[in-house]
A protein has these predicted regions:
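A short, glycine/small-residue-rich beta-strand->loop->alpha-helix junction that serves as a flexible
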Residues: 6-21, 191-193
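A charged, aromatic-enriched C-terminal amphipathic alpha-helix characteristic of glycosyltransferases
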Residues: 17, 319-353
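Acidic donor-binding loop of glycosyltransferase active sites
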Residues: 76, 127, 251-265, 278
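Conserved donor-binding/catalytic core segment of Leloir-type glycosyltransferases
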Residues: 3-7, 175-193, 199
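Membrane-proximal helix-turn-helix segments that form the acceptor-binding/catalytic region
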Residues: 112-129, 253
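A short, active-site helix/loop in glycosyltransferases that binds the activated sugar's phosphate group
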Residues: 124-150, 158-163, 224
Length: 358
């Protein structure tokens, strides 16, 4: 079977995350001599380039060439994360949603409608839509009730992340924060100023060069956050980036990551951070739109980001107490190890070994 894996998407998915999932799929399928993998795309990370160089069963191919090849073959299937390949309608399509239009803030009504329409089209067209964990399964089945029979959880753990030696991590910090240690924060725009106030308290306490790096969902939010930053006393210690520009090295090099009001689209980032021994902090305030599922509550530390002094105290704690920070990271690692062991022993679909061409 020729398995075409598309590396583009209509939806907002960090490039590093999407390409890591492509790597995970192929690594889990290399044991089969019946599958030849075609990675469709360009400007791919070194991890996928190396995978092709070291495996005869892997070929990187540009989209135009893939469109030509798909017309010439008879035994093929397509895996995608929200994309199309011209000329492939006669073959089985498998949709792996890593995000959903409702997870993207700030969309215009027309843009959100267009993305939702595309999402439903992929659901309808797919032979099966595979989710990567029970959080995504619950969310998508509740939202797209018409397609619940197509939506099912698959076994697709992180297989192998890039290994960064301390020199590479130091380079990442130099590029991002001029060498300063930093916290990484996924914070909604409407809570941005509140976190700045808490970070100010921490900076006044500690007199440190620690930096707070915010990751927003799109360039529009980045621009709005930058306008709110005008006049902030510790402006030089704040960095603002879009998730589309985020690199895996940023995760691997951070002190800790703060997640506020997250959707299932951040679950892969959670797993990656844990693999890199990074402790996680979750907002468990009762006013959140979606609470952290019970099965994921041991992945990190939970407290209310809205409680006065809560964030500033945790900034201080993770900055000053390395033993505590490492202990929290180990707790996350233990949780993820147990989760993967449990999933491996259940009757989940194994991607790509269980896929068929029609």
């Amino acid at each position: 079977m020729r398995l075409f894996i598309l590396t583009s998407s209509k939806f907002t998915i960090p490039r590093a995350l999407l390409c890591q999932k492509v790597l995970d799929i192929i690594e889990l399928g290399l044991s089969s001599a019946q599958i030849h993998f075609y990675i469709v795309g360009d400007n791919l990370p070194d991890s996928l380039l190396t995978l092709e160089q070291t495996n005869d069963a892997v070929t990187i191919i540009k989209e135009v060439a893939a469109e030509k090849l798909i017309k010439e073959v008879t035994n093929a299937a397509i895996i995608h994360f929200g994309a199309d390949l011209k000329g492939s309608d006669q073959f089985a399509h498998y949709f792996i949603p890593l995000s959903d239009p409702s997870c993207i803030p700030g969309l215009s009504m027309i843009h959100k409608w267009s993305l939702t329409k595309a999402f439903k089209k992929y659901l309808k067209k797919s032979v099966a839509t595979y989710t990567i964990n029970e959080w995504a399964t619950r969310f998508l089945k509740n939202k797209y009730k018409r397609y619940t029979t197509k939506i099912q959880e698959a076994y697709l753990p992180i297989h192998r992340l890039p290994i960064y030696e301390w020199v590479a991590l130091a380079d990442a910090k130099n590029s991002l924060t001029d060498g300063a240690n930093y916290f990484l924060a996924f914070q909604p725009l409407d809570a941005f100023v509140d976190m700045l106030k808490e970070f100010s308290i921490f900076k006044k306490w500690q007199q440190t060069n620690m930096v707070l790096v915010f990751i927003f969902e799109n360039e529009k939010e980045v621009a709005q956050a930058e306008s709110l930053l005008v006049g902030y006393k510790f402006k030089d210690a704040i960095l603002i980036n879009s998730i589309s520009n985020m690199e895996l090295k940023w995760i691997a090099a951070t002190y800790a990551i703060l997640f506020n009001n997250i959707c299932f689209d951040k679950t892969s980032l959670i797993e990656m951070a844990i693999e890199y021994d990074i402790p996680l902090l979750f907002n468990n305030d009762e006013n959140q739109n979606e609470s952290l599922p019970t099965a994921w509550q041991q992945a990190g530390e939970q407290f209310s980001f809205e409680e006065k002094g809560g964030l500033s105290n945790h900034f201080k704690l993770y900055y000053k107490d390395e033993v505590y920070r490492q202990g929290r990271a180990r707790m996350g690692k233990d949780w993820l190890t147990d989760l993967y062991a449990e999933k491996k022993n259940t009757a989940l679909v194994k991607i790509p070994l269980a896929l068929k061409t029609n």
